[in-house]
């Protein structure tokens, strides 16, 4: 016997609020509009976004990157800090494609949750739009997925996707790096978006509170400082010093020890000098509170260097000056040497 349902069901009864999704799109559209740039043919609201590659490129090569924010999001949930993780999301992808010498053109995001909070999602997307403005790329589309039962209330996950372009003849691949080249480092804003599982473990061990004073700032402000976006500054240096910049490394998961080798040919090593830059107070505190060994620090965290630039020694001072004029804090942190037998491709001495 077939039983009749007591009342008709709706999608909202199942946990999906279409009206909330529409309200979020209305909140997002003006945020995305601020990021528009030449080349955008169709953006938010369509089935697909359209972008025309700028005509200035003779042989354009498209460069893509995707990433998330990792467990830094857990602190965003616990501390109710949702306005900066969107900047982190953009930074992780645009800095990655910058490493190939690419200019970021457009960005898409994916926001997944169990129950959609329009205010929370709008705060996150506001950060994404701010990151896109800093990178000079258009927030051209995205996806908001409300999936009941998949995530606890108040939690969400993020993924970002960046596409850029570089002239084929100007691709940075590190193949010209040789012994004697100079290693420059650009300052980070903090832990950026990596190592936060260890950060959270140390915070728990230390009994730290988000509102406690940390050298004149609330600890939460320091820990949640958004990842720096290096795009415009580095692109300016690349344009001003053709051939002088030989390689870039975005210091993300794996720290200095695992990321710099990604741009080095076999037989080369980067020798970095720990006294060449000041490790920020956050990392000093994390190391002390967690009893973390030096090698582990350099393998997990950026330790104050968010982007590494390998340059021809003859142009090192000029490149550093250009970056400083763009507002970067630049340190000469090491040099490229011939790799010794049994030696790692990056050593901190």
Swiss-Prot record:
Cited InterPro entries: PurM-like_C_dom, PurM-like_C_sf, PurM-like_N, PurM-like_N_sf, PurM_cligase
Highest classification ranks of the organism: Bacteria, Pseudomonadati, Pseudomonadota, Betaproteobacteria, Burkholderiales
Known EC number: 6.3.3.1
Protein name as it appears in the record: Phosphoribosylformylglycinamidine cyclo-ligase
The keyword Nucleotide-binding is assigned to this record: yes
KW Protein transport (keyword) present: no
Pathway: Purine metabolism; IMP biosynthesis via de novo pathway; 5-amino-1-(5-phospho-D-ribosyl)imidazole from N(2)-formyl-N(1)-(5-phospho-D-ribosyl)glycinamide: step 2/2
Assigned protein family: Belongs to the AIR synthase family.
GO molecular function list: ATP binding; phosphoribosylamine-glycine ligase activity; phosphoribosylformylglycinamidine cyclo-ligase activity
């Amino acid at each position: 016997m077939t039983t009749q349902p007591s009342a008709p069901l709706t999608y909202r009864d199942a946990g999906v609020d279409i009206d909330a999704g529409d309200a979020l799109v209305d909140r997002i559209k003006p945020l995305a509009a601020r990021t528009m740039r030449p080349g955008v043919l169709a953006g938010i609201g369509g089935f697909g976004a359209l972008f025309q590659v700028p005509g200035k490129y003779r042989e354009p090569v498209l460069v893509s990157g995707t990433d998330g924010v990792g467990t830094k999001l857990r602190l965003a949930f616990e501390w109710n800090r949702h306005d900066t993780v969107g900047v982190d999301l953009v930074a992780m992808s645009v800095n990655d494609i910058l490493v190939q010498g690419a200019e970021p053109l457009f960005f898409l995001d994916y926001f997944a949750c169990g129950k959609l909070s329009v205010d929370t999602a709008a705060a996150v997307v506001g950060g994404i739009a701010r990151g896109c403005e800093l990178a000079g790329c258009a927030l051209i589309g995205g996806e908001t997925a409300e999936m009941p039962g998949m995530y606890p209330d108040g939690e969400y996950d993020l993924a970002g996707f960046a596409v850029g372009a570089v002239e084929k003849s100007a691709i940075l691949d590190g193949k010209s790096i040789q012994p004697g080249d100079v290693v420059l480092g650009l300052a980070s804003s903090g832990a950026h978006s990596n190592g936060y599982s260890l950060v959270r473990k140390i915070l728990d061990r230390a009994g730290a509170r988000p509102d406690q004073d940390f050298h004149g700032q609330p600890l939460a402000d320091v820990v949640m400082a958004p990842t720096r976006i290096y795009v415009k500054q580095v692109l300016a240096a690349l344009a001003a010093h053709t051939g002088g910049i030989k390689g870039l490394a975005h210091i993300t998961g794996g720290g200095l020890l695992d990321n710099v080798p990604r741009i080095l040919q076999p037989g080369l090593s980067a020798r970095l000098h720990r006294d060449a830059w000041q490790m920020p107070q956050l990392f000093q505190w994390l190391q002390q509170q967690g009893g973390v060994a030096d090698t582990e620090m350099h393998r997990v965290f950026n330790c104050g260097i968010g982007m590494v630039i390998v340059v021809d020694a003859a142009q090192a001072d000029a490149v550093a000056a250009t970056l400083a004029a763009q507002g970067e804090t630049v340190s000469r942190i090491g040099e490229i040497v011939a790799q010794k037998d049994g030696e790692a491709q990056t050593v901190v001495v």
